[in-house]
A protein has these predicted regions:
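N-terminal beta1-alpha1 ligand-phosphate binding loop
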Residues: 2-39
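Glycine-rich phosphate/pyrophosphate-binding loop and the adjoining helix
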Residues: 2-7, 61, 139-208
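A general structural signal for well-ordered alpha-helical segments in protein cores
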Residues: 24, 28, 66, 94, ...
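Short beta-strand elements in bilobed, periplasmic/extracellular small-molecule ligand-binding domains
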Residues: 39-53, 140-148
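N-terminal beta-loop-helix "entrance" segment that forms/cooperates
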Residues: 46-64, 155-156
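Helix-loop-strand module that forms the ligand-binding subsite of alpha/beta enzymes
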Residues: 61-139
């Protein structure tokens, strides 16, 4: 890993939980603090609740919040998604947002990391996000499950468990480094990550 980040790397953070107090929001806070210390520019997209249900018939309409979402994704160098797992799948709000990117090309060859904090660590949510991101041409370069987050947090919901904070920091370092990683290396990295989740690594967008 590199020791620092070139100032100006744009990190887009997306929290899939709409709760006022969320372990996934707390995970993003840890990542954002480290990214800020390394000179990255952080853009936190907090409008998932405003995005309407995806309708292909409206894909080309001028919907302000959707256009804002697409613009901010396109402008990002790297993306961090933290999402809870609901009923064995990814949170509907975050999946809906990424559905609005279908066919846009905004995720093509973009490095992404996924965190899921929840009772069991959100394996199914992480697998679902790996599929969605890979099918959209993104490179999933890191993923992390945080189980039993309440036991790893203080009374205000901030992560205090050293191992958890270190794991989130390591994921963030890897994601930021991915902004300057050669394309062929990103392909190999993403193939290993999605393959470890049981997703077909052959679906990873090739370097050529």
């Amino acid at each position: 890993m590199q020791n620092d980040v070139r100032p100006g790397i744009r990190l887009l953070t997306v929290c899939g939980s709409l709760q006022a107090r969320s372990a996934n929001r707390a995970a993003i806070a840890v990542a954002s603090s480290l990214a800020d210390a390394r000179g990255a520019t952080i853009d936190d997209f907090d409008r998932l609740a405003d995005i309407p249900a995806f309708n292909p018939d409206r894909a080309f309409e001028h919907i302000a919040v959707v256009e804002d979402w697409r613009r901010r994704v396109a402008a990002a160098d790297v993306v961090l998604v933290a999402t809870p797992e609901y009923a064995g799948g990814v949170a509907g709000a975050v999946k809906n947002a990424f559905d609005w990117l279908v066919g846009s090309g905004h995720m093509y060859r973009k490095p992404v990391a996924v965190i899921s904090a929840g009772t069991t660590g959100g394996l199914h949510a992480r697998v679902a996000m790996a599929q969605t991101l890979t099918w959209q041409g993104a490179y999933l370069v890191a993923e992390l499950g945080v189980a039993a987050p309440r036991t790893k947090s203080d009374d205000d919901g901030r992560f205090t468990d050293g191992a958890t904070v270190t794991a989130i920091a390591s994921l963030t370092e890897l994601l930021l480094d991915a902004a300057a990683t050669p394309l062929a290396d990103l392909v190999d990295l993403a193939g290993g990550v999605v393959g470890s989740l049981g997703v077909d690594a052959g679906r990873v967008t090739p370097a050529v």
